[in-house]
């Protein structure tokens, strides 16, 4: 079972109950109807990245759906949190890519998103034997990775939120959702 398509999604939920907050975040991300199974960080060879609506059209309620899921929650008022997915796609579509998940507190969306993107790109770069200075800033390493001719694209999706002012549970999710076949 190798996914042939994948899509990114994100969402936020707020509720007095922690589990209900998570459910609302999944609803906001449009993936609450599925039995989600978290998997590790490999983007399969020849897996086409598609818009969320195209991917959702091939899934049916109750289906077992694999995804790389970033999830974070808090009931602390005004606490900033993030859930991010980073992706690195190789030039040669016959090779696999990497997906990373990142969950943090106190990071703005761009910081958390770029961290996840950097992590995925670095994991792919090390498997491809690309030499780089780990102390370089992300934007400098990104140029090294792309100049190598092995990494085609990197990107991220991030959901941030601040904890509900009244202390209700607030949840953020970001996910790379896989489509294996028409359900």
From Swiss-Prot:
Enzyme Commission no: 4.1.1.19
Alphabetized InterPro entries for the sequence: Pyr-dep_his/arg-deCO2ase, Pyr-dep_his/arg-deCO2ase_sand, Pyruvoyl-dep_arg_deCO2ase
Cofactor binding, note field: Binds 1 pyruvoyl group covalently per subunit.
Domain of life: Archaea
Cofactor: pyruvate
Pyruvic acid (Ser): residues bearing it: 41
Site for Cleavage (non-hydrolytic), residues: 40-41
EC primary class: lyase
PANTHER family hit by this protein: PYRUVOYL-DEPENDENT ARGININE DECARBOXYLASE
Protein name stated in the entry: Pyruvoyl-dependent arginine decarboxylase 2
